[in-house]
A protein has these predicted regions:
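Short, well-ordered beta-strand segments in beta-rich or mixed alpha/beta enzyme
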Residues: 67-68, 103, 115, 162, ...
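Bacterial N-terminal signal peptides
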Residues: 6-18
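Glycine- and acidic-residue-biased ligand/ion/polar-headgroup-sensing regions
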Residues: 60-78, 173-193
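Positively charged n-region of N-terminal signal peptides that target proteins for export
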Residues: 1-5
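Histidine-centered divalent metal-coordination motifs
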Residues: 57-59, 101, 171-173, 215
Length: 233
């Protein structure tokens, strides 16, 4: 029996479609574990075993990811050539949403990151938030650094590194901010008018903090403290 060319074409299309990875929402991607959600952010802790890959998943919102530990990752964005990323511990990047991809861990150790979606990204594009007093710059501290990395969608990202005993000088948070622990942290926050409060965090821990206060932050641990802050208006 001879098969018609049209029938063979249909069969080929069915096989091709079945071979393509189905697209899932980020909330259904099993390597993305929801850690925190509020009107400002949706935060996922991501862990990918050596040589493993995520499902094809969609990023609908602009987001920042914070790398935990060195890694090498292949980024396969749908409709674009593959790209290889060599990442260092604490590397923090912003990516605009609206794409679908697969991430593959090319290294021999787990790929870990914290992914923070900006839930008000569309609002920020339509009505840009106020400018920050400073949007880029490195501050050298006594025993540490404060590096303002970038401002995206009105959110200011900074990396803080404090050696044991070092203090981040007094500063004011008018709005809320998110803390992402890159290293384990043993810190003390001294809020003006309230006194000192201890903070104990493991690497990858996140904490949402309200605004409306001034404080200093001291590393009271025995090792370097590294963390990322995302500040909101």
């Amino acid at each position: 029996m001879k098969l018609r060319p049209a029938f063979l074409l249909i069969i080929s299309c069915v096989v091709l479609l079945s071979a393509q990875a189905p697209e899932v929402e980020i909330t259904a991607e099993p390597h993305h574990h929801l850690a925190l959600q509020n009107p400002f952010v949706r935060v996922f802790k991501v862990e990918l075993a050596p040589q493993a890959a995520t499902l094809m998943h969609r990023h609908r919102h602009d987001y920042v990811f914070v790398t935990l530990g060195p890694s090498e990752v292949e980024n396969d964005v749908q409709g674009k050539p593959s790209a290889t990323l060599k990442l260092k511990d604490g590397d923090t990047y912003f990516l605009p949403g609206g794409f679908t991809h697969i991430a593959k861990n090319l290294s021999g150790q787990p790929f870990r990151n914290v992914t923070i979606e900006f839930m008000q990204d569309e609002k920020a594009r339509k009505s840009p938030p106020p400018k920050w007093d400073e949007e880029r710059g490195m501050h050298i501290l006594e025993g540490g650094t404060q590096d303002i990395l970038f401002v995206k969608d009105g959110v200011r990202a900074s990396e803080i590194i404090l050696q044991p005993g070092a203090t981040l000088p007094k500063h004011h948070h008018a709005g809320p901010h998110l803390l992402v622990a890159v290293s384990d942290l043993e810190i003390r926050s001294h809020v003006v008018g309230q006194g000192p409060m201890p903070g104990h965090f493991k690497s990858a821990d996140v904490k949402w903090l309200p605004g409306g206060y001034s404080h200093t932050v001291t590393n009271v641990g025995k090792s370097e403290a590294k963390f990322i802050t995302l500040e909101f208006h």
